[in-house]
Amino acid sequence: MGPLIAPSILAADFARLTDEAAVVASADWLHVDVMDGHFVPNLTIGLPVVQSLLAASDIPMDCHLMIDNPDRWAPPYAEAGAYNVTFHAEATDNPVGVAHDIRTAGAKAGIGVKPGTPLNPYLDILPHFDTLLIMSVEPGFGGQAFIPEVLSKVRTVRKMVDAGELTILVEIDGGINADTIEQAAEAGVDCFVAGSAVYGAADPSAAVAALRRRAGAVSPHLRR
């Protein structure tokens, strides 16, 4: 498997979301940040907009729910047709139950952790998930600087995967660009969320291809 690139529409033009999805049709996933103004201070889009995007684009939808009460709100995104639905470990006392409901509704289940959240308390439940999303910025706003300290979490999980102890995709979100993607790939990331590095480029499609090449060139596990 090669590196997966997931452009984040948080950096796109919200007045032209259908067009903005189309210009990154070569991407592996389309990363959609859902924020409720409670779990994080920002407010973005919700289920109706995601449903419209799903109807307009064939790119697998990677929904990142930065919201309270994912127990209630996560399954409807799976039911709508999202490929992967990620909620935050910090937002629920029943992450395994939420993952089960997401999978039952037809999507892959992801669990996300903020930069300051220790990963160790969640290692035992990772077999219930398809994706681990490691935040490399504080969730809520795009354009922040990459926090390299989170790569220790990536390395921990990569060792487990390489040892055959776990099957999961490692995704990273925040501050990913042409330089930081190499650090993340070397640490063991599989999927890279990129906002400004894609939508801030003159040619977003070419930016996706360039990021994919850079990650694949330096990653031992992605070159296998």
Curated annotation (Swiss-Prot):
It is an enzyme of class 5 (isomerase). GO terms for biological process: pentose catabolic process; pentose-phosphate shunt. PROSITE patterns: RIBUL_P_3_EPIMER_1, RIBUL_P_3_EPIMER_2. A divalent metal cation binds at residues 31, 33, 64, 173. Substrate binds at residues 8, 64, 140-143, 173-175, 195-196. The lineage of its organism: Bacteria, Bacillati, Actinomycetota, Actinomycetes, Mycobacteriales. Keywords: Carbohydrate metabolism, Isomerase, Metal-binding. Pfam families: Ribul_P_3_epim (PF00834). This is Ribulose-phosphate 3-epimerase. Binds 1 divalent metal cation per subunit. Catalyzes the reversible epimerization of D-ribulose 5-phosphate to D-xylulose 5-phosphate. The active site is at residues 33, 173. Its EC number is 5.1.3.1. Pathway: Carbohydrate degradation. Belongs to the ribulose-phosphate 3-epimerase family. It comes from Mycobacterium leprae (strain TN). Its cofactor is a divalent metal cation. CDD domains: RPE (cd00429). It catalyses: D-ribulose 5-phosphate = D-xylulose 5-phosphate. The gene is rpe.
